[in-house]
Amino acid sequence: MFIDNHDVERVASILEDKNQLPLIYTMLFTMPGIPCIYYGSEWGMEGTKNWNDTDLRPEIKVFEWNELTDTIQKLIHLKHNHSALSYGDYTQIGITNTACIYQRQDEKECLWICMNMKNEAQTLGFNGQGNFIDMETNEELCIHNTLEFKPYEVRILKRSSD
């Protein structure tokens, strides 16, 4: 699975709001399939398609480690260490224009991927109750059908009993 390549405009050039880039990469690494990243996109490189595609395939001389690169590194680590993200079943819990919640589950664990794709805070309906662990912060959360999200926030949650 990929979000851009040498034949299409880079995703960073398409998005009006670059704060959505981490959300796209979260989907890439947590949905079924093998994630592929076109060189330079891990840094948020832009490029538009033209008659000879030179903007899509520039020479990269300087490595630009940034916040997006950090996010992708964490997602690679998460996918490598949680079999549900590679082999688990996918269940869509709720998808709207501004939010997305889905589940990845195998025989070992059940992960809930939750995203606020909006530039303002919102409360998302959460079709689940109980104790969960936030995979990024290790914070234990007691959830009762709703969850508060900051703008563009992503949470990957695991039931604490798994």
Spans of model-derived segments:
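Alpha-amylase-like alpha-glycosidases and glucanotransferases acting on alpha-linked glucans and related
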Residues: 1-34, 43, 50, 85, ...
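Carbohydrate-interacting/catalytic domains
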Residues: 32, 37, 41-162
